[in-house]
Amino acid sequence: MKLTCVVIVAVLFLTANTFATADDPRNGLENLFLKAHHEMNPEASKLNERCLSGGEVCDFLFPKCCNYCILLFCS
């Protein structure tokens, strides 16, 4: 019985804390995830960059080859 009361109080506390720390309590956490997605800079992500395959011409100072840049060609 005591454990059940403690669990109920803990769940109520965590729920109240979640809504109190959210920017917009009407939308809860859903709104936070949407804002975080729009605040990201997709151009800054290195995952969006395409690497050059073997045989393509590469830049010596800033190579974007999948492996290595040797004599201005990707290996």
UniProtKB/Swiss-Prot annotation:
Disulfide-bond pairs as recorded: C51-C66, C58-C69, C65-C74
Cellular component GO terms held in the UniProt record: extracellular region
Subcellular location field: Secreted
Keywords: Disulfide bond, Ion channel impairing toxin, Knottin, Neurotoxin, Secreted, Signal, Toxin
Pfam assignment, any one: Conotoxin
MF (Gene Ontology): ion channel inhibitor activity; toxin activity
Tissue distribution: Expressed by the venom duct.
Positions of the propeptide segment: 23-49
Main location: secreted
The keyword Acyltransferase is annotated on this UniProt entry: no
Signal sequence extent: 1-22
Protein family membership: Belongs to the conotoxin O1 superfamily.
Domain free text: The presence of a 'disulfide through disulfide knot' structurally defines this protein as a knottin. The cysteine framework is VI/VII (C-C-CC-C-C).
Protein name: Conotoxin Vc6a
Organism: Conus victoriae (Queen Victoria cone)
